[in-house]
């Protein structure tokens, strides 16, 4: 250890600890469970704020330097004259200094471990503060930095105190010897890059600074240094033993004792006391400073994500005279996690992981997470039927785990290790020089977090290949904590360093035989020889932009194959940052918007929620697929359904099933039943229906489960599950349409014109298109009605293609190469016939690119005596071109309807491979709500399986998908950010007979399942269109 008295700033800079993988800290205290040092038991029991902890969050003084060598030597003892205020916690890039960098795989610095660039942005923080005189008289005062990116040196009152790296775990230092009465000064030199940055190559914004809490903690001379709590349940789960281990420190602990008291809901359950000294450990004896208790508990209330039953354990350290020296406390959850018979189990029952990956991200605050945002994340997750979260890819803020304990979420706690940009990826994992750094990131995480019942799995990190260092750390984990399984995806997801087969983006039925690390279909994987472990996808369903297609297919597999135990969606929140344009207007920015290089553009936008936590439509698909109730239509006569509960541990004590029978959205009958279902139980319900009268339209039975009472995570009336089925309808014979005045055809060399009362249609002979429709003398079209075979590319269509790199296999590149974004229409035939009751216009167009025919579109337009336009359209597709994104029509309407009314799937956006959550019904929304404001503009807003659409005066009937909004497909295709879109007059209507799925198994390879790709080379569709007075 260096001599602290001789360490000048220049000496520290010369030593360059931040480029030495063998140096991860100087003087940093050992990791331990979070400590509060209450001095009375009651506040510890109540989890009240401890007077022994003092937050140093607030406004510090700050200077930014492009490199540490530019820091003046005097800064250690006094602020620079040009120091500015800096909020702590914060990332300095969010405060106007330096540049945030978004990159996924590529390191943001040249890869030359352990060395980092000489230009190493450095933030110099300082704070003056006073200390309570009583703290100076006795005991120990520490400072705790919960998170500093990426490394820092610390001074107090001009004295160098130490060094630390690892951005996501606490760094704690003893300041007792240097604190003084009156004013004290902290100085913290934070480096943007260090050798540890090579272990922190996560897919996220790369930012710097003191971004988590800073706290002073005062401990008595004799103190509780650490504690560990383990619950041991018998096979019947009706008896438990609470095992608690405490380590003491300081002078005189041999004469002390610790009183352990277990509480539940304020009532004392048990209390025992112990003096220091462990049982004999080996031939050299026992631990003098440690003590262990085992407290038997009969019929414990068990913890699970469904029933987060918590006890409170207080540990009071008593002095020789029985005086309370300090108290530590923690929440305790009695649960057992194990893997048996190839299944991950909690309390003896196989789990189904409804999980999501979550990075700590806030659009204004960067990587600073406040309690309100954490709570909001958990509440939204649970409202949408998530029961698990993976801390991707680093240990989270300490409060996160306490909230997961209390709300009820299963947690994968993941070490801050990712070397994705290394070639090979396992380069550092197989290098013994990097074992100490990797080891600290695993062992310190466990020492901090092991008492949380919500943590059911440890993870060795992410995307770092597989090497000997991983094997060593796996063995350490299994020895240190045999109560939890370990997972690690690197090296193929099924190495000896994982208890769970945990692939990312493996598909349901399709093998991906990559060299060295094949990804088999998940169904195949669990049946491979000698593979007996459960399979839980550590990442799947890449929710980038308008994506998430095929999610229901995964859940069909999970529910059908017991050893397919779910997975973690990638990911929770769009990682966009708030930025202001040249006019001062805020918008959400992604990679490259700050001039950052390298960058991966919008690949940071993979969330189920927008940065402000507004849901993406995909979130509803997740909610529906993961719902805890499944429904079966047993019979229609009598009408009987079966409801099965997917809850493993709780009965339905707050659930009501409501049902309606509706014809074309109009409710014919309804009812409500209180559910009384045991865990994993079934309830059969017979629904008494009145006689249904014959009438036009489809009849649907809709059921939904709501929770009438509010819960800690949801409001009263929260809808948690739903289903619907079509019912047989009484035979209905539609009356013949009334006759009216027939339309009249007039024509010349340029146009065909049809007139009916106050309406007039005009077809252009040169193009063959319907170019105008007058109603009451007013033009209602701003563009012709044209064929539409392309869409503004989705992220999944683009894949990895960008300006400097082209993936010829990406859908968008195939469409571009075929000319589908640059088609011209050539009229081959256009004629009209006057009939007694109608006018028929027949057109034939070829859609071609540079003289090559891609599509042939034949349209038969019938205008009847009711003034209704009937379309009968057949499209033939060339055999040697890529499958199209859509087949349909597009038109720019002059009217801007205030609302949209439709009979079909809704109410939210849905696509052919992402429509499980949508329901058949009649829906009405404002026009603005028909648009989904994806940050990177794409095709959006589709509603599938529509039978009737009303847009102001326009009414369309048939069987089609549609989208309507203020932006053309061309504008969506050419615009890079949502805030740059400009509303166009009127409204754009896209009417689709076919629309390709959006895909979503991943976003870098074609992932639309074949059943959602047009397999035929000819498609015919019909519809009717009228304008109401």
UniProtKB/Swiss-Prot annotation:
<keyword id="KW-0479">Metal-binding</keyword>
<protein>
    <recommendedName>
        <fullName>Beta-galactosidase 2</fullName>
        <ecNumber>3.2.1.23</ecNumber>
    </recommendedName>
</protein>
<feature type="binding site">
    <location>
        <position position="603"/>
    </location>
    <ligand>
        <name>Na(+)</name>
    </ligand>
</feature>
<dbReference type="InterPro" id="IPR014718">
    <property type="entry name" value="GH-type_carb-bd"/>
</dbReference>
<feature type="binding site">
    <location>
        <position position="1004"/>
    </location>
    <ligand>
        <name>substrate</name>
    </ligand>
</feature>
<feature type="binding site">
    <location>
        <position position="418"/>
    </location>
    <ligand>
        <name>Mg(2+) 1</name>
    </ligand>
</feature>
<dbReference type="GO" id="GO:0005990">
    <property type="term" value="P:lactose catabolic process"/>
</dbReference>
<feature type="active site" description="Nucleophile">
    <location>
        <position position="539"/>
    </location>
</feature>
<dbReference type="InterPro" id="IPR036156">
    <property type="entry name" value="Beta-gal/glucu_dom_sf"/>
</dbReference>
<feature type="binding site">
    <location>
        <position position="104"/>
    </location>
    <ligand>
        <name>substrate</name>
    </ligand>
</feature>
<feature type="binding site">
    <location>
        <position position="420"/>
    </location>
    <ligand>
        <name>Mg(2+) 1</name>
    </ligand>
</feature>
<keyword id="KW-0326">Glycosidase</keyword>
<dbReference type="InterPro" id="IPR023232">
    <property type="entry name" value="Glyco_hydro_2_AS"/>
</dbReference>
<keyword id="KW-0460">Magnesium</keyword>
<feature type="binding site">
    <location>
        <position position="606"/>
    </location>
    <ligand>
        <name>substrate</name>
    </ligand>
</feature>
<dbReference type="InterPro" id="IPR004199">
    <property type="entry name" value="B-gal_small/dom_5"/>
</dbReference>
<feature type="binding site">
    <location>
        <begin position="539"/>
        <end position="542"/>
    </location>
    <ligand>
        <name>substrate</name>
    </ligand>
</feature>
<dbReference type="InterPro" id="IPR023933">
    <property type="entry name" value="Glyco_hydro_2_beta_Galsidase"/>
</dbReference>
<dbReference type="Pfam" id="PF02929">
    <property type="entry name" value="Bgal_small_N"/>
</dbReference>
<comment type="similarity">
    <text>Belongs to the glycosyl hydrolase 2 family.</text>
</comment>
<feature type="site" description="Transition state stabilizer">
    <location>
        <position position="393"/>
    </location>
</feature>
<dbReference type="InterPro" id="IPR006102">
    <property type="entry name" value="Glyco_hydro_2_Ig-like"/>
</dbReference>
<dbReference type="Pfam" id="PF00703">
    <property type="entry name" value="Glyco_hydro_2"/>
</dbReference>
<feature type="binding site">
    <location>
        <position position="463"/>
    </location>
    <ligand>
        <name>substrate</name>
    </ligand>
</feature>
<dbReference type="GO" id="GO:0004565">
    <property type="term" value="F:beta-galactosidase activity"/>
</dbReference>
<dbReference type="Pfam" id="PF16353">
    <property type="entry name" value="LacZ_4"/>
</dbReference>
<feature type="binding site">
    <location>
        <position position="599"/>
    </location>
    <ligand>
        <name>Mg(2+) 2</name>
    </ligand>
</feature>
<dbReference type="Pfam" id="PF02836">
    <property type="entry name" value="Glyco_hydro_2_C"/>
</dbReference>
<keyword id="KW-0378">Hydrolase</keyword>
<dbReference type="GO" id="GO:0030246">
    <property type="term" value="F:carbohydrate binding"/>
</dbReference>
<feature type="binding site">
    <location>
        <position position="203"/>
    </location>
    <ligand>
        <name>Na(+)</name>
    </ligand>
</feature>
<dbReference type="GO" id="GO:0009341">
    <property type="term" value="C:beta-galactosidase complex"/>
</dbReference>
<dbReference type="InterPro" id="IPR011013">
    <property type="entry name" value="Gal_mutarotase_sf_dom"/>
</dbReference>
<dbReference type="InterPro" id="IPR017853">
    <property type="entry name" value="Glycoside_hydrolase_SF"/>
</dbReference>
<feature type="binding site">
    <location>
        <position position="606"/>
    </location>
    <ligand>
        <name>Na(+)</name>
    </ligand>
</feature>
<feature type="binding site">
    <location>
        <position position="203"/>
    </location>
    <ligand>
        <name>substrate</name>
    </ligand>
</feature>
<dbReference type="GO" id="GO:0000287">
    <property type="term" value="F:magnesium ion binding"/>
</dbReference>
<dbReference type="InterPro" id="IPR006101">
    <property type="entry name" value="Glyco_hydro_2"/>
</dbReference>
<dbReference type="InterPro" id="IPR006103">
    <property type="entry name" value="Glyco_hydro_2_cat"/>
</dbReference>
<keyword id="KW-0915">Sodium</keyword>
<feature type="active site" description="Proton donor">
    <location>
        <position position="463"/>
    </location>
</feature>
<dbReference type="InterPro" id="IPR023230">
    <property type="entry name" value="Glyco_hydro_2_CS"/>
</dbReference>
